[in-house]
Amino acid sequence: EISACLVGSEMCIRDSSMVSTSEKYASSSLTDEKSLELFRTLERIMREEKIYKDNFITKDKVAEILGTNRTYLSRIINEQSKLSFTHYVNRFRIEEAIRLLSDPNNETPLKAISTELGFNSISTFYNLFQSSVGMTPSQYRNKVMELQKEQ
């Protein structure tokens, strides 16, 4: 059976009955070095440019920023962080929420923090925060205030 495939950015035609599964993946896989380089670039962009704050962030947008495609992006994130794209993005959002809520002088309403961090709903923010931290954002903020008063 003849089929079309994509290798790099060039289109090719192959007889798929003659191509082993490992050869298919080998021809489309990134080298470990290239994969690590792209992941480091992604980490830098996430931390410095805070693209996770975009509530319409997609694999396609991030892949375009990195000059790769969504398949490679997913593979890189999974291989390097052991997370899906969505979980990876949300990890940055929750880390930023923790940072903001750890500041006892920050009185920004939770709804505003949720929106600022790219969450489409406050309930999603609450649920993810609680599953990651073990308490709701309100509980976390109150705990920070209590600890601040004790000092």
PLM regions and their residue ranges:
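The DNA-contacting recognition helix of HTH DNA-binding domains
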Residues: 70, 121-123
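ABC-family nucleotide-binding domains
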Residues: 118
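Membrane-proximal linker segments that couple transmembrane helices to downstream signaling/catalytic modules
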Residues: 14-115, 128-131, 138-151
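Single conserved hydrophobic/aromatic residue that forms the stacking wall/gate
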Residues: 1-15
